[in-house]
Amino acid sequence: VNGVKIYFDGAMGSRGAYLLEPYSDDLNNIGLTITNENQIRKKVKIFNDAGFQVAIHCIGDKANRIALNIFEEIDSKSSRNRIEHAQIIHNEDINRFYELGVIPSMQAIHCTSDMYWIDERLGPKRIDQSYPWQSLLKSGSIIPGGSDAPVESPDPLLGVYAAITRKDLDGWPIGGWLPNERMTIDQAISSITEWSAYSMFSEEFYGKIHKGYLADFTVLNNNLSQIEPKHIPEVKVLYTFVNGVIVYQHDK
């Protein structure tokens, strides 16, 4: 066991994400906290001192800011502490992730699930703070990707598609939702390979096909870098290798 997860706030859909300002569609509500701020501060200190990485569930911009403040106070970059989801980040806090060595662990597919209604929750002035992947990457951060299954599909290719298009499977919206924050295909692939390995202290064993690394990899029927993004969800896994052994083979 490398780390522990602490829940700070709720979800955006239920208006439970902890915000700096009230919800645009619920002016008396700024969300909620599941774990008390002082309890989180104590737990982070205890777990980091014991050698554990801490991942804090934060969706709203206030939750993210407070978590960053706590990590700054603890000052434990070597722990590679993470913020899980990091969906809504105030513009003033973008650079702090890299500066503090805090890893934003994000799930691209959440963006394309939430984009239909999130403008109602946040309003036009805050909407550009939603899933700011490219802003984080340009500041120096890495973004390990995931699916948050069973909340979303565990298929990593759907996550890659969401990351580089910010569209749903029907191609909506044209041009992508907040397209300036899309990842490149190379960034999206790194997100589910080498960056994820780094985020779990396994970058010397996983995340690359390279001499000395474990032979854990997949073989696809197409090159993700050479096909149109709209075709990525159609790509099939032909083989899955674990420690050099075929554990899955697609039926011909």
Regions found by a protein language model. Name each.
Residues 16, 250-252:
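Short linear motifs in exposed loops
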Residues 44-55, 62-81, 85-86, 91-98, ...:
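His/Asp/Glu-enriched, well-ordered alpha-helical/loop segment
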